[in-house]
Structures are given as structure tokens and as C-alpha cells.
Amino acid sequence: MLPIIKKFIIKIERQIVKILLSFRKDVVSFDPPPSGMNKETVLKKVAEVPFWWHSIDFGYGIVTPGHQGGIKHPTGTKNLLGNLQLPDDLRGKSVLDIGAWDGFFSFEAEKRGASRVLAIDNFYRDKLEHTGSQGFEIAKEILKSNVEFKKASVYDLSPEKFGMFDIVLFLGVFYHLRHPLLALEKVFSVTKEMLIMETHYDPYHDSKTPLAVFYENAEINNDPTTFWGFNKSCLLAVLRSVGFKNPEVIYRYADRIILKAYK
């Protein structure tokens, strides 16, 4: 298929997803949050954060105004969660959430029974427009969470410094990295069982040959921190090359893809 036709199809797919999400009605909680914080206080704390990336349900019908995949809609985060195939029962499991931002997926892992959850983020986008760990800290307080947080980069990871984790979440980070293979080696070093990875990818070169496109001038979402578009074959190949076994694609649409790989 010609690249120009593929680009048109992908543009249409993204518009369809936006339309479907606009009609989707997720069940939200009207109960108090685990902290027991009253509604007025929750609303005040949510308003203190000028930018929420994740949609987090705080009870009382209050859901933060998330911004997922360019879709500013309260169901965006849950839509991604449904495609990750994260196990419903995480009792006894340790989970690492790389690039956790507001912490939705960290708190979800805790909710599913994970015995330890560590969220890391270096908030490299702070200088552009955002607010560091403020959203995470407020969410943790409202949810009365025990999720740990460390300000760190994926390049900082090592078993000696952070320990090992049964499940590693690596969501929306890979294509922002100048040194993607080094990052995957670091991720592999702290993974005990399984990696779940979501990223932008290059759908235009859907061949068996591993290929990667370098974005020099903010071609993706006009974001100067995006650098790479690996095609599907290349993503599977680099996961194997750093040591992961049986990498597989579990979901993709438009220019986004979700993969699982095993230790």
C-alpha cells in the first residue's frame, strides 16, 4: 500500500477513535475516596494541578481531565488500560511503572493487589509545559496510596538501585528516547517476568525488514521530544536483541502499538 494512502487511513482511524470516545460512558465512582477526603477538598486539590495527563477517578463523580493520545477526554486513560491486558489479579506481584506521570497505571496496579508498586518519572517535559510530580502527589494523597515514587530516568535503572520487578510498564516513553536500545537494556535488567510496552510506531513501512525512522524536527504531534518511529518488525527485533523472549503485538491502531515480552 502506498505511504500516502496509509497516512490517509491512519488519519481516519484516529478521527474514528476520537468520535467513539466522545460517546463512551465509563462508570465512575460516587463514593468517597479511600482517604475519606470530603468532596470540596478533593475538588480544590484537583484544581491546584494546571495540567492532568491521566484521567483518575477520585470518587464523588470527580474524574481528572486527562489528555491521552491527543484525545482530551475523561475516558482516554481507561481506553488505553483496557488494551494493555494487565492481569486483573496482581496479588504478590511487584510492578514498575516507567514514565508514570500522574500515576494512573501505578494506582491501578496497586488496586489490583500488587504487593509493591514503584513509579518513576524524570518529568523531562517540565520545561515545556507541565508541572512535575504535583498531580501524582495529590492523587496519592486522595487515594491514600502506598505507591512509591522516585524521580528518575529509564537510564538510571539497575537491579542494585531499584530492585527487580515481576511486571514492568513502559508506556508512551520509548519514542521519546535518544538512546532506545540502551533504555531497553536497562528495562530488561530490572524485569523478572513480563514487560508491557506502549509506544508510537511507524505503520507506513509494515514489512518483515526491521526499519526505524528518525524524527529530527518534531514531526510527531509537533513535540520536540519525539525522536523515533520503529516499525513493528523492528520493535520485535530490538526486544529480542536485548534478551526478551517471545515478544508479541497485542494491540495496535493508527500509529500506536502495544507489545508484551517475557524474561
Model-inferred region functions:
Residues 104-151, 156:
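Class I SAM-dependent methyltransferase SAM/SAH-binding core
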Residues 70-93:
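Conserved alpha-helix/loop element of class I SAM-dependent methyltransferases that forms part
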